[in-house]
Amino acid sequence: MRCFRTKGYDEVSVNDICGEADIARSTFYRAFSNKKDVIRYRFEHTDANQIVSIEELLAARNDFDRMWVIGDRYISLCCELGPTFCAAMMNLTLAGEIDMLQVAHSVDAWFVRLTRNCQQTGIIRSHEPPELLGPLFVDLEYQTLYEWCRSQGEYPVRAQARRRAEMLANLAPEYRWSKEQLENADKM
């Protein structure tokens, strides 16, 4: 994955992947047909249950922040891979070759439960059904990542994702991030 991050998806060849992994091309071709298969494998083996530690979830101060911890983990993965690579994954999704959204929506059941809890405690003031609202948080984050890719990484992806999620939820003011937190969100 490192060579995708440094060179970008389009510029990486199978030779580059083999050189980075220190394997023969024949070894590569026993597992994969092409570089798209590497991306497909990476996304098919990304699971929400593996992406966030229980410690991170327990440390969050409320259920909305737990949703943020989960969502931010996906943002972090995309930021680690870079906007060019992330954009290539989005293009492969549009072409029907991988399904980034399926992986992202693997957290929907969690988001529905956490949204319901937040509505019951008054953290989320939106009265939309949790079954509709929970998955919308994922869609909104995906759209925010799209903007980040489009700007070649020159877009405050974390601050915008957090602010948009707060607005979608009609989050109670005491749970919203401060201006300072938003300004520092992308310096992580």
Identify the residue ranges that each predicted region occupies.
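Short, hydrophobic secondary-structure boundary micro-motifs
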Residues: 84-89, 123-127, 157, 179-181
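Hydrophobic alpha-helical connector segments
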Residues: 41, 52-81, 130-137
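Amphipathic alpha-helical segments used for helix-helix packing
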Residues: 75-98, 146-150
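Short coil/turn segments at alpha/beta junctions that flank glycine-rich nucleotide-binding fingerprints
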Residues: 6-10, 81, 121
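Generic hydrophobic, amphipathic alpha-helix propensity
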Residues: 1, 17, 42-46, 50, ...
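C-terminal effector-binding regulatory domain of bacterial HTH transcription factors
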Residues: 171-188
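Amphipathic alpha-helical packing segments from all-alpha helical-bundle domains
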Residues: 48-51, 96-123, 131-139, 146, ...
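Helix-turn-helix
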Residues: 3-37, 41
